[in-house]
Amino acid sequence: MSRRCELTAKGVQTGHKVSHSNIKTKRRFLPNLVNVTFLSDALGRPVRLRVSTNALKSVDHRGGLDAFLLKASVAELSPKAAELKRAIAKKKAAEPAAAAS
């Protein structure tokens, strides 16, 4: 399992730990990742993703997982999240057609 957010593609960064005497030592900055189960309104089922806490705020701000995925670009999403986006878009496109009939 990689240390990368499935929604925002936030990953590991590298840098230096700097001592008082300005000696630099390589270190890694790990993203704050959590395993979360989101409820998809369009799909009507729970979806389990590994996301950063920053992505949790973004999903909440945009009004849920469905709205976040529909606005996000496919380039920054994981393959699993991109597949979810396609499924949600397909369901949303089928809803108005079913209501019109």
Curated annotation (Swiss-Prot):
Keyword Ribonucleoprotein attached: yes
Organism superkingdom: Bacteria
One Gene Ontology molecular-function label: structural constituent of ribosome
Pfam families per UniProt: Ribosomal_L28
Keywords noted in UniProt: Ribonucleoprotein, Ribosomal protein
Biological process terms in GO annotation: translation
Family annotation (InterPro entries): Ribosomal_bL28 (IPR026569), Ribosomal_bL28/bL31-like_sf (IPR034704), Ribosomal_bL28_bact-type (IPR001383), Ribosomal_bL28_sf (IPR037147)
GO cellular component: cytosolic large ribosomal subunit
Entry keyword annotation includes DNA-binding: no
Family: Belongs to the bacterial ribosomal protein bL28 family.
Record protein name field: Large ribosomal subunit protein bL28
Species for this entry: Rhodopseudomonas palustris (strain HaA2)
